[in-house]
Curated annotation (Swiss-Prot):
Binds to the N-terminal domain of the chaperone ClpA. PANTHER family: ATP-DEPENDENT CLP PROTEASE ADAPTER PROTEIN CLPS, ATP-DEPENDENT CLP PROTEASE ADAPTER PROTEIN CLPS1, CHLOROPLASTIC. GO terms for biological process: protein catabolic process; proteolysis. Involved in the modulation of the specificity of the ClpAP-mediated ATP-dependent protein degradation. InterPro entries: ClpS (IPR022935), ClpS_core (IPR003769), Ribosomal_bL12_C/ClpS-like (IPR014719). Belongs to the ClpS family. Gene3D superfamilies: 3.30.1390.10. This is ATP-dependent Clp protease adapter protein ClpS.
């Protein structure tokens, strides 16, 4: 008699996603913010300029949406680069 096997379907859920948000300040230059957006978030010049203006006019702006691990890594890269350049630029991570 052949053995029968029951296969259970495992339902995989999508991972939670997190927004990386840059916060405007009165010291960090617009050029530095664009550099961050291009180098860390891989935005082209046009998109980086649009995002920078959003941050400047609204006080903050979303730079990208990632899994938690990647979002936290990008936040750390922003803060480290800003400290190295003597800018107070801050980034925060929020669940979407």
């Amino acid at each position: 008699m052949p053995k029968t096997q029951t296969l259970e379907q495992t339902k995989l859920s999508e991972p939670k996603m997190y927004k990386v948000i840059l916060l405007n300040d009165d010291v960090t230059t617009m050029d530095f913010v664009i550099e961050i957006l291009m180098n860390i978030f891989h935005q082209n010049l046009e998109k980086a300029s649009q995002t920078m203006l959003e941050i400047h006019h609204n006080g903050s702006g979303i730079c990208g949406i990632y899994t938690q691990e990647i979002a936290l890594s990008k936040q750390k890269k922003v803060i480290d680069a800003a400290k190295l350049a003597n800018f107070p630029l801050q980034a925060k991570v929020e669940e979407e």
